C-alpha cells in the first residue's frame, strides 16, 4: 500500500504544523516562500461549519498555492458523515493529504467534537 508523498520525504523532515488562527492561507504563503517546509498543514477547519452554513468563510482557509505542496487539510467534527464530505471536498480541491484532528487541547474545541 502506497503512503503517498510521505514515502518520498527525506528524514528528518520539516513540517509546518496546523495551528488554529496561525496557519491561514496568507501565513502559509509567506512560509512557503521563505522557509519552504517539507510538508504544510492548513489550520484545522470545522467540517460542521463547512456544511452547516459557514462554507464561504471557511473554504478560504483551504486555499493554497503550488508552492505549499505537499499540503494536508486538517478537519475536525464529531459527525462521521460531515468528515466524509470534508474529505471529499479536500480531494476535489487537490490536497495531497487529509488529517483528522482528534486531540485539540483547546476546551472550546473539545466540546465541539
Protein language model regions, located:
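Extreme N-terminal starter segment of soluble prokaryotic enzymes
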Residues: 2-3, 8-14
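A short alpha-helix capping/helix-coil boundary motif
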Residues: 6-8, 63-68, 107-110
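Glycine-rich, proline-tolerant flexible connector loops at the mouths of alpha/beta enzymes
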Residues: 44-51, 102-113
